[in-house]
Protein backbone atom coordinates (compact mmCIF):
# COMPACT_ATOMS: atom_id res chain seq x y z
CA UNK A 1 0.00 0.00 0.00
CA UNK A 2 1.17 3.49 -0.86
CA UNK A 3 1.07 5.50 2.37
CA UNK A 4 0.75 8.68 0.32
CA UNK A 5 -2.78 7.68 -0.71
CA UNK A 6 -5.55 9.28 1.32
CA UNK A 7 -7.87 7.02 3.33
CA UNK A 8 -11.35 6.41 1.96
CA UNK A 9 -14.33 8.03 3.68
CA UNK A 10 -17.67 6.22 3.56
CA UNK A 11 -20.67 8.56 3.35
CA UNK A 12 -24.13 7.31 4.28
CA UNK A 13 -26.96 9.08 2.47
CA UNK A 14 -27.29 10.17 -1.15
CA UNK A 15 -28.63 13.70 -0.78
CA UNK A 16 -27.20 17.09 -1.68
CA UNK A 17 -25.08 17.34 1.47
CA UNK A 18 -23.12 14.26 0.42
CA UNK A 19 -22.97 15.64 -3.12
CA UNK A 20 -21.35 18.85 -1.89
CA UNK A 21 -18.67 16.88 -0.03
CA UNK A 22 -17.45 15.58 -3.39
CA UNK A 23 -15.84 18.80 -4.65
CA UNK A 24 -13.55 19.45 -1.65
CA UNK A 25 -12.84 15.71 -1.43
CA UNK A 26 -11.62 15.75 -5.02
CA UNK A 27 -9.48 18.82 -4.36
CA UNK A 28 -7.89 17.15 -1.34
CA UNK A 29 -7.49 13.81 -3.12
CA UNK A 30 -9.76 12.03 -0.62
CA UNK A 31 -11.75 9.09 -2.04
CA UNK A 32 -15.42 8.89 -1.10
CA UNK A 33 -17.59 5.77 -1.07
CA UNK A 34 -21.32 6.39 -0.96
CA UNK A 35 -24.36 4.47 0.20
CA UNK A 36 -27.37 5.98 -1.57
CA UNK A 37 -30.99 5.07 -1.00
CA UNK A 38 -31.72 4.92 -4.75
CA UNK A 39 -29.91 5.17 -8.08
CA UNK A 40 -29.69 8.66 -9.53
CA UNK A 41 -29.85 10.51 -6.23
CA UNK A 42 -28.02 13.82 -5.95
CA UNK A 43 -24.75 12.48 -4.52
CA UNK A 44 -24.76 9.30 -6.61
CA UNK A 45 -24.52 11.47 -9.73
CA UNK A 46 -21.08 12.78 -8.75
CA UNK A 47 -19.55 10.03 -6.57
CA UNK A 48 -18.71 7.10 -8.89
CA UNK A 49 -17.96 4.67 -6.07
CA UNK A 50 -21.51 4.26 -4.83
CA UNK A 51 -23.82 1.48 -3.77
CA UNK A 52 -27.60 1.54 -3.70
CA UNK A 53 -28.99 0.06 -0.51
CA UNK A 54 -30.83 0.50 2.76
CA UNK A 55 -28.98 2.35 5.54
CA UNK A 56 -31.23 0.56 8.04
CA UNK A 57 -29.64 -2.79 7.11
CA UNK A 58 -26.47 -3.52 9.10
CA UNK A 59 -24.96 -5.91 6.56
CA UNK A 60 -25.36 -3.29 3.83
CA UNK A 61 -23.59 -0.76 6.04
CA UNK A 62 -20.78 -3.23 6.72
CA UNK A 63 -20.32 -4.00 3.03
CA UNK A 64 -20.13 -0.33 2.07
CA UNK A 65 -17.76 0.66 4.88
CA UNK A 66 -15.41 -2.32 4.53
CA UNK A 67 -11.88 -1.06 3.90
CA UNK A 68 -12.77 2.56 4.71
CA UNK A 69 -10.99 4.50 7.44
CA UNK A 70 -14.02 6.45 8.61
CA UNK A 71 -17.76 6.71 8.02
CA UNK A 72 -19.76 9.94 8.14
CA UNK A 73 -23.30 10.93 7.28
CA UNK A 74 -25.57 12.96 5.03
CA UNK A 75 -28.41 12.54 7.56
CA UNK A 76 -28.98 11.44 11.15
CA UNK A 77 -31.30 8.48 10.54
CA UNK A 78 -28.95 5.47 10.78
CA UNK A 79 -30.07 3.27 13.73
CA UNK A 80 -27.96 3.84 16.83
CA UNK A 81 -27.37 0.11 17.36
CA UNK A 82 -25.90 -0.14 13.85
CA UNK A 83 -23.53 2.73 14.59
CA UNK A 84 -22.27 0.96 17.71
CA UNK A 85 -21.70 -2.20 15.66
CA UNK A 86 -19.73 -0.27 13.04
CA UNK A 87 -17.50 1.27 15.71
CA UNK A 88 -15.83 -2.12 16.13
CA UNK A 89 -14.69 -1.96 12.50
CA UNK A 90 -13.86 1.68 11.70
CA UNK A 91 -14.09 5.23 13.01
CA UNK A 92 -17.70 6.48 13.14
CA UNK A 93 -17.73 10.29 12.99
CA UNK A 94 -19.70 11.70 14.60
CA UNK A 95 -19.94 8.76 16.97
CA UNK A 96 -23.24 7.25 18.13
CA UNK A 97 -22.97 8.71 21.64
CA UNK A 98 -22.83 12.18 20.09
CA UNK A 99 -25.20 11.60 17.18
CA UNK A 100 -28.07 10.44 19.38
CA UNK A 101 -28.43 14.06 20.55
CA UNK A 102 -29.25 15.06 16.97
CA UNK A 103 -31.43 11.99 16.42
CA UNK A 104 -33.61 12.26 19.52
CA UNK A 105 -34.95 15.63 20.66
CA UNK A 106 -35.83 14.37 24.14
CA UNK A 107 -32.29 13.10 24.69
CA UNK A 108 -30.93 16.39 23.37
CA UNK A 109 -33.12 18.51 25.65
CA UNK A 110 -32.22 16.47 28.73
CA UNK A 111 -28.49 16.71 28.04
CA UNK A 112 -28.54 20.42 27.28
CA UNK A 113 -30.50 21.04 30.48
CA UNK A 114 -27.87 19.10 32.44
CA UNK A 115 -25.20 21.30 30.86
CA UNK A 116 -27.08 24.49 31.72
CA UNK A 117 -27.46 25.45 28.05
CA UNK A 118 -30.42 27.84 27.57
CA UNK A 119 -33.38 26.12 25.88
CA UNK A 120 -37.14 26.67 25.60
CA UNK A 121 -39.20 25.17 28.42
CA UNK A 122 -40.02 21.60 27.39
CA UNK A 123 -41.36 18.24 28.55
CA UNK A 124 -42.04 14.79 27.12
CA UNK A 125 -45.83 14.33 27.04
CA UNK A 126 -47.85 11.14 26.67
CA UNK A 127 -51.41 12.48 26.50
CA UNK A 128 -53.48 15.50 25.61
CA UNK A 129 -54.06 16.02 29.33
CA UNK A 130 -50.31 16.38 29.85
CA UNK A 131 -50.13 18.90 27.00
CA UNK A 132 -52.94 20.85 28.64
CA UNK A 133 -51.06 20.80 31.92
CA UNK A 134 -47.93 22.00 30.09
CA UNK A 135 -49.91 24.95 28.73
CA UNK A 136 -51.15 26.42 25.46
CA UNK A 137 -50.08 27.68 23.03
CA UNK A 138 -47.14 25.35 22.58
CA UNK A 139 -45.26 23.37 19.95
CA UNK A 140 -45.42 19.59 19.74
CA UNK A 141 -42.60 17.66 18.08
CA UNK A 142 -41.99 14.00 17.42
CA UNK A 143 -38.75 13.19 19.18
CA UNK A 144 -37.25 11.51 16.11
CA UNK A 145 -37.46 11.86 12.36
CA UNK A 146 -38.69 15.42 11.81
CA UNK A 147 -36.99 17.89 9.45
CA UNK A 148 -37.87 20.94 7.33
CA UNK A 149 -41.03 21.56 9.34
CA UNK A 150 -42.16 17.93 9.33
CA UNK A 151 -43.00 16.38 12.68
CA UNK A 152 -43.78 19.79 14.21
CA UNK A 153 -47.22 21.14 15.18
CA UNK A 154 -48.28 24.40 16.79
CA UNK A 155 -51.22 23.70 19.06
CA UNK A 156 -53.49 26.26 20.70
CA UNK A 157 -56.06 23.91 22.22
CA UNK A 158 -56.53 20.29 23.26
CA UNK A 159 -58.42 19.30 20.12
CA UNK A 160 -55.36 20.11 17.99
CA UNK A 161 -53.08 17.52 19.65
CA UNK A 162 -54.34 14.37 17.93
CA UNK A 163 -52.18 14.60 14.80
CA UNK A 164 -48.94 14.78 16.79
CA UNK A 165 -49.79 11.77 18.95
CA UNK A 166 -50.96 9.77 15.92
CA UNK A 167 -47.73 10.51 14.06
CA UNK A 168 -45.63 9.59 17.09
CA UNK A 169 -47.53 6.33 17.63
CA UNK A 170 -47.15 5.40 13.96
CA UNK A 171 -43.39 6.04 14.09
CA UNK A 172 -42.90 4.45 17.50
CA UNK A 173 -41.48 7.63 19.05
CA UNK A 174 -42.38 10.09 21.80
CA UNK A 175 -43.89 13.57 21.71
CA UNK A 176 -42.02 16.58 23.08
CA UNK A 177 -43.89 19.73 24.12
CA UNK A 178 -42.03 23.03 23.95
CA UNK A 179 -43.06 26.54 24.86
CA UNK A 180 -44.00 28.79 21.97
CA UNK A 181 -41.01 31.12 21.95
CA UNK A 182 -41.55 34.81 21.29
CA UNK A 183 -38.51 35.26 19.07
CA UNK A 184 -37.19 38.11 16.99
CA UNK A 185 -35.43 35.86 14.48
CA UNK A 186 -33.61 32.56 14.08
CA UNK A 187 -29.83 32.28 14.16
CA UNK A 188 -27.35 29.50 13.49
CA UNK A 189 -23.93 28.94 15.03
CA UNK A 190 -21.80 26.55 12.99
CA UNK A 191 -18.58 24.93 14.18
CA UNK A 192 -16.30 22.13 13.04
CA UNK A 193 -14.49 19.96 15.59
CA UNK A 194 -11.81 17.31 15.13
CA UNK A 195 -11.19 14.24 17.34
CA UNK A 196 -8.07 15.92 18.71
CA UNK A 197 -10.23 18.80 19.93
CA UNK A 198 -9.45 21.55 17.41
CA UNK A 199 -12.50 23.75 16.79
CA UNK A 200 -13.23 26.19 13.99
CA UNK A 201 -16.23 28.55 14.31
CA UNK A 202 -17.83 30.46 11.43
CA UNK A 203 -19.62 33.79 11.95
CA UNK A 204 -23.11 33.48 13.45
CA UNK A 205 -25.75 33.84 10.73
CA UNK A 206 -29.42 34.76 10.46
CA UNK A 207 -31.67 32.02 9.10
CA UNK A 208 -34.98 33.02 7.52
CA UNK A 209 -37.53 30.20 7.62
CA UNK A 210 -40.67 29.96 5.50
CA UNK A 211 -43.10 27.12 6.02
CA UNK A 212 -40.61 25.36 8.26
CA UNK A 213 -37.96 25.35 5.52
CA UNK A 214 -34.80 27.45 5.46
CA UNK A 215 -35.33 30.05 2.73
CA UNK A 216 -32.44 32.50 3.22
CA UNK A 217 -29.27 32.85 5.23
CA UNK A 218 -27.44 36.13 5.85
CA UNK A 219 -23.83 36.00 7.00
CA UNK A 220 -23.06 37.51 9.41
CA UNK A 221 -26.41 38.06 11.16
CA UNK A 222 -27.22 41.75 10.58
CA UNK A 223 -27.23 43.92 13.67
CA UNK A 224 -26.55 41.07 16.07
CA UNK A 225 -25.28 42.33 19.41
CA UNK A 226 -21.59 41.34 19.64
CA UNK A 227 -22.17 39.87 23.08
CA UNK A 228 -24.94 37.61 21.77
CA UNK A 229 -22.76 36.56 18.83
CA UNK A 230 -20.00 35.52 21.21
CA UNK A 231 -22.52 33.72 23.43
CA UNK A 232 -23.91 31.80 20.44
CA UNK A 233 -20.45 30.71 19.31
CA UNK A 234 -19.49 29.70 22.85
CA UNK A 235 -22.65 27.60 23.16
CA UNK A 236 -21.84 25.82 19.89
CA UNK A 237 -18.23 25.18 20.88
CA UNK A 238 -19.20 23.97 24.35
CA UNK A 239 -21.89 21.63 23.01
CA UNK A 240 -19.42 20.24 20.46
CA UNK A 241 -16.86 19.57 23.18
CA UNK A 242 -19.26 18.20 25.82
CA UNK A 243 -20.96 15.84 23.35
CA UNK A 244 -17.63 14.92 21.72
CA UNK A 245 -18.85 15.86 18.25
CA UNK A 246 -16.58 15.16 15.29
CA UNK A 247 -17.27 17.07 12.09
CA UNK A 248 -19.66 19.97 11.58
CA UNK A 249 -22.16 20.88 14.28
CA UNK A 250 -24.97 23.33 13.54
CA UNK A 251 -26.72 24.85 16.54
CA UNK A 252 -30.00 26.44 15.50
CA UNK A 253 -31.00 29.24 17.87
CA UNK A 254 -33.79 31.64 18.70
CA UNK A 255 -32.96 35.27 19.41
CA UNK A 256 -35.85 36.22 21.67
CA UNK A 257 -37.59 39.57 21.73
CA UNK A 258 -36.17 40.19 25.21
CA UNK A 259 -32.58 39.69 24.04
CA UNK A 260 -31.84 36.08 24.99
CA UNK A 261 -30.40 33.16 23.02
CA UNK A 262 -32.18 29.77 23.19
CA UNK A 263 -31.14 26.54 21.48
CA UNK A 264 -33.75 25.19 19.07
CA UNK A 265 -32.16 22.22 17.26
CA UNK A 266 -28.82 20.45 16.73
CA UNK A 267 -27.50 18.93 13.49
CA UNK A 268 -24.25 16.95 13.34
CA UNK A 269 -23.43 17.22 9.65
CA UNK A 270 -23.04 19.98 7.08
CA UNK A 271 -26.15 22.13 7.32
CA UNK A 272 -28.28 24.34 5.10
CA UNK A 273 -27.35 27.38 7.19
CA UNK A 274 -23.71 26.75 6.28
CA UNK A 275 -24.08 26.65 2.49
CA UNK A 276 -22.95 30.28 2.33
CA UNK A 277 -19.46 29.11 3.35
CA UNK A 278 -18.92 27.50 -0.06
CA UNK A 279 -18.30 30.92 -1.58
CA UNK A 280 -18.30 33.31 1.36
CA UNK A 281 -15.71 31.76 3.69
CA UNK A 282 -12.04 30.87 3.40
CA UNK A 283 -12.90 27.24 4.18
CA UNK A 284 -16.33 25.78 3.50
CA UNK A 285 -18.27 23.66 5.95
CA UNK A 286 -17.89 20.73 3.54
CA UNK A 287 -14.11 20.89 3.43
CA UNK A 288 -13.81 21.34 7.17
CA UNK A 289 -16.16 18.41 7.76
CA UNK A 290 -13.83 16.20 5.72
CA UNK A 291 -10.77 17.56 7.48
CA UNK A 292 -12.41 17.03 10.86
CA UNK A 293 -13.47 13.41 10.36
CA UNK A 294 -9.90 12.59 9.24
CA UNK A 295 -8.44 14.58 12.15
CA UNK A 296 -6.59 16.92 9.80
CA UNK A 297 -5.88 20.55 10.77
CA UNK A 298 -8.99 22.64 10.20
CA UNK A 299 -9.17 25.49 7.72
CA UNK A 300 -9.83 29.14 8.53
CA UNK A 301 -13.54 29.99 8.90
CA UNK A 302 -13.10 33.70 8.14
CA UNK A 303 -15.54 35.45 5.81
CA UNK A 304 -14.23 36.43 2.37
CA UNK A 305 -16.52 39.45 2.09
CA UNK A 306 -18.43 41.71 4.49
CA UNK A 307 -21.71 40.03 3.48
CA UNK A 308 -22.81 36.76 1.94
CA UNK A 309 -26.44 35.88 1.25
CA UNK A 310 -27.60 32.34 0.51
CA UNK A 311 -31.07 31.81 -0.94
CA UNK A 312 -32.46 28.33 -1.48
CA UNK A 313 -33.93 27.48 -4.86
CA UNK A 314 -37.17 25.76 -3.96
CA UNK A 315 -38.62 23.90 -6.90
CA UNK A 316 -41.54 25.60 -8.58
CA UNK A 317 -44.02 24.26 -11.08
CA UNK A 318 -42.40 21.90 -13.59
CA UNK A 319 -43.96 23.94 -16.42
CA UNK A 320 -42.47 27.28 -15.36
CA UNK A 321 -39.48 26.46 -13.14
CA UNK A 322 -35.98 26.44 -14.56
CA UNK A 323 -32.81 24.46 -13.92
CA UNK A 324 -30.01 24.54 -16.50
CA UNK A 325 -32.11 26.73 -18.79
CA UNK A 326 -32.07 29.40 -16.11
CA UNK A 327 -28.33 29.93 -16.47
CA UNK A 328 -28.18 32.35 -19.45
CA UNK A 329 -30.20 35.06 -17.71
CA UNK A 330 -28.96 34.48 -14.15
CA UNK A 331 -25.26 34.33 -15.02
CA UNK A 332 -25.38 37.21 -17.51
CA UNK A 333 -27.24 39.45 -15.07
CA UNK A 334 -24.81 38.75 -12.23
CA UNK A 335 -21.35 37.44 -13.21
CA UNK A 336 -20.39 37.26 -9.51
CA UNK A 337 -23.33 35.00 -8.61
CA UNK A 338 -22.50 31.48 -7.48
CA UNK A 339 -25.06 28.81 -8.37
CA UNK A 340 -25.23 25.32 -6.86
CA UNK A 341 -27.78 22.91 -8.36
CA UNK A 342 -28.29 19.46 -6.87
CA UNK A 343 -29.22 17.37 -9.90
CA UNK A 344 -32.84 17.08 -8.77
CA UNK A 345 -36.03 17.42 -10.77
CA UNK A 346 -38.47 20.24 -10.12
CA UNK A 347 -41.21 19.74 -7.56
CA UNK A 348 -43.04 22.47 -5.63
CA UNK A 349 -41.24 23.22 -2.36
CA UNK A 350 -38.35 20.83 -3.05
CA UNK A 351 -34.81 22.09 -2.44
CA UNK A 352 -33.21 21.81 -5.89
CA UNK A 353 -30.27 24.16 -5.35
CA UNK A 354 -29.10 27.42 -3.85
CA UNK A 355 -27.38 30.63 -4.87
CA UNK A 356 -24.74 32.64 -3.02
CA UNK A 357 -24.17 36.36 -3.52
CA UNK A 358 -21.37 38.12 -1.68
CA UNK A 359 -20.11 41.69 -1.58
CA UNK A 360 -19.76 44.91 0.38
CA UNK A 361 -23.43 45.96 0.40
CA UNK A 362 -26.06 43.81 2.12
CA UNK A 363 -29.05 45.17 0.20
CA UNK A 364 -27.28 44.50 -3.09
CA UNK A 365 -26.44 40.92 -2.05
CA UNK A 366 -30.04 40.32 -0.98
CA UNK A 367 -31.44 41.63 -4.26
CA UNK A 368 -29.04 39.62 -6.40
CA UNK A 369 -29.58 36.34 -4.57
CA UNK A 370 -33.36 36.72 -4.32
CA UNK A 371 -33.70 37.63 -7.99
CA UNK A 372 -31.66 34.62 -9.10
CA UNK A 373 -33.58 32.18 -6.89
CA UNK A 374 -36.90 33.58 -8.09
CA UNK A 375 -35.75 33.25 -11.70
CA UNK A 376 -34.82 29.59 -11.29
CA UNK A 377 -38.06 28.96 -9.41
CA UNK A 378 -40.03 30.41 -12.31
CA UNK A 379 -41.53 33.35 -10.42
CA UNK A 380 -40.02 35.80 -12.94
CA UNK A 381 -40.06 35.89 -16.72
CA UNK A 382 -43.27 33.91 -17.26
CA UNK A 383 -45.72 36.78 -16.85
CA UNK A 384 -46.82 36.75 -20.51
CA UNK A 385 -47.42 33.00 -20.62
Regions found by a protein language model. Give the residues of each.
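Peripheral (often C-terminal) accessory segments that flank ATP-dependent C-N-forming ligase machineries
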Residues: 5, 291-385
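Active-site "cap" helix and flanking loop/linker of ATP-utilizing ligase/carboxylase catalytic domains
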Residues: 230-251, 257, 267-320
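ATP-binding N-terminal substructure of ATP-dependent carboxylate-amine bond-forming enzymes
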Residues: 1-107, 376
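Internal nucleotide-binding/catalytic subdomain
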Residues: 151-258
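A conserved helix-loop-beta module that forms one wall/lid of the active-site cleft
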Residues: 89, 95-152, 158
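Structural motif corresponding to alpha-helix initiation and N-cap regions
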Residues: 54-58, 80, 128, 158, ...
Amino acid sequence: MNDALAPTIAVIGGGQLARMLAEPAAALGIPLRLLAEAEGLSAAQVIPDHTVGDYRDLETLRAVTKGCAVVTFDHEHVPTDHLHALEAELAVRPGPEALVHAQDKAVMRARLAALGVPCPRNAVVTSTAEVTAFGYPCVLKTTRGGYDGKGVWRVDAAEQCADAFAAAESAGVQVLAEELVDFRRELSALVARSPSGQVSAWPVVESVQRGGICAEVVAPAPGLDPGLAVQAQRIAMRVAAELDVTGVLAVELFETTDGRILVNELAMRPHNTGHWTQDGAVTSQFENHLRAVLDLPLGAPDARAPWTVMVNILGGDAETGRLYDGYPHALARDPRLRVHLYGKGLRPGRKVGHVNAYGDDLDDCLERARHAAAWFRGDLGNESE
